[in-house]
Amino acid sequence: MSKHNAVGIDLGTTYSCVGVFMHGKVEIIANDQGNRTTPSYVAFTDTERLIGDAAKNQVAMNPHNTVFDAKRLIGRKFDDPAVQSDMKHWPFKVISAEGAKPKVQVEYKGENKIFTPEEISSMVLLKMKETAEAFLGTTVKDAVVTVPAYFNDSQRQATKDAGAIAGLNVLRIINEPTAAAIAYGLDKKGHGERNVLIFDLGGGTFDVSILTIEDGIFEVKSTAGDTHLGGEDFDNRMVNHFCAEFKRKHKKDLASNPRALRRLRTACERAKRTLSSSSQASIEIDSLFEGIDFYTNITRARFEELCADLFRSTMDPVEKSLRDAKMDKSQVHDIVLVGGSTRIPKVQKLLSDLFSGKELNKSINPDEAVAYGAAVQAAILSGDKSEAVQDLLLLDVAPLSLGIETAGGVMTALIKRNTTIPTKTAQTFTTYSDNQPGVLIQVYEGERAMTKDNNLLGKFELSGIPPAPRGVPQIEVTFDIDANGILNVSATDKSTGKQNKITITNDKGRLSKDDIERMVNEAEKYKADDEAQKDRIGAKNGLESYAFNLKQTIEDEKLKDKISPEDKKKIEDKCDEILKWLDSNQTAEKEEFEHQQKDLEGLANPIISKLYQSAGGAPPGAAPGGAAGGAGGPTIEEVD
């Protein structure tokens, strides 16, 4: 096993998870709060940046500067209808930057800061990287990061960039359902060929993939899904329902208050989880809005009615992927549930009914399966030779058809959807008019017949074609998809051998090399800020506990009579003065806390050592720098 462990990271819309393959099995790694999944939340305050649990715990107190759902922004345009509808639910501010890219605007340390979705995602990835490093005790460089199978080219590319900004070498971007299939099928060697349907409904995205698994070979037959459907959408329905109820009962509009809305959302999320195991859930929020308490309840039936169309819509991709895989329902051996939202009984019932009452497979942990599979893939790619993974082969597919625009705005597909990747294909095209000097090659992805209905990935010009009648020049266009599902396109004029190529990266509002460099440096800077903040708090806590310890020492029954009243008063006054100073200078610099501590030590040490010489023995507790609640001390926050 190489010294440097490669990890697998499931970068989720709402929660993320990290795993590592070691000693022949996968370890899912718990974070510093002991949780095996970490909220994909980043918060900015007057003093610090928080990532994960700490960020989510303070969201009600700081709704405008707590960013989540970055995965619903990444690789999308600002005017994407999905982005526009999400913005109505987000308390943080999303603005349109150059190239119509969405960015988030927050206030950090009293200044306005603007971040790309890639940067926010990179902060979550950084947290996962640090979680793994704390567990492994070494630095982590290499990672396999997962994306929804239905993510398009720009979303994949942007996710890869986020990894780079976090200082990770992304070995491979793999599809979430495929990763989950590895988790499911890893121990099923020698069971013959099995057709497995992975139904992955998470916090923000939905995928269905059908694979054939046989002796460690995982071949994806088809994939379908919706990159904008998940638990968050079910929460939204419940939030809207209760907002309307509040308006009816109290004639007040909750939507005008982000904090109230956030507290309601947190309660809805909790109620939704309760409804997966009970038939009714109650919501009790004290002083939700203008001092009004909100006590109400919701039944499972009501919740199912609120989300009925969303639940039903999860069945369409299942049928589509069956059609694409040219498979009958009866040929599916196992239906495997992945993602937290598959715990919803109604979703399970719809799926089971679609397969005429077939039992669903719940053998893998729906929250951890994706990170588990990613960790296995990371081990393989970094050359792990252990028996569990050595014969494993992954054959994934391109989720969307890829092609170019030909005369009349027609989409001519070179690579059909569900083609196994990596793949390379070439086709020869010609000019449309006489003596045409160049051709514009426009690359699209999507299933519609006309390019205007599909997604433009990028375009480039092949110029310098020698004059010739239309139809004579031969231009060979080559599409090449790598194992990450990212596309390279080249065009060659056969008569002159002139070539031009692009990795589909430009036009996409994709980050340039310079942008990434700059963001990597900024990420380092923010990390240094976080460290400095930790040291500062450490110095503050150290001073505070030293002052309290000193006071306790001089109050000690055994020592009371060994210390002169004036010495005792000196120390008491100084301690009180310092504790008072601390109260009014919570935000002082580390050096100031250290200076105050030196000051106090200077006064106390001679008195204390005099004391112990007379009493004999070493001083308890109040040794200089008695940092009881030191740098790693817990900070306690109220959670709604």
From Swiss-Prot:
Signal peptide: none annotated. Induction: Induced by white light exposure. This is Heat shock protein hsp-1. PROSITE patterns: HSP70_1 (PS00297), HSP70_2 (PS00329), HSP70_3 (PS01036). GO terms for biological process: chaperone cofactor-dependent protein refolding; determination of adult lifespan; protein refolding; response to heat; retrograde transport, endosome to Golgi. Residues 623-633 have a biased composition (Gly residues). SUPFAM superfamilies: Actin-like ATPase domain, Heat shock protein 70kD (HSP70), C-terminal subdomain, Heat shock protein 70kD (HSP70), peptide-binding domain. It comes from the Eukaryota. One of its GO terms (cellular component) is cytoplasm. AMPylated by fic-1. Belongs to the heat shock protein 70 family. GO terms for molecular function: ATP binding; ATP hydrolysis activity; ATP-dependent protein folding chaperone; heat shock protein binding; protein folding chaperone. Keywords: ATP-binding, Nucleotide-binding, Stress response. Residues 613-640 are annotated as: Disordered. Interacts with E3 ubiquitin-protein ligase chn-1. It comes from Caenorhabditis elegans. Pfam families: HSP70. The keyword ATP-binding applies.
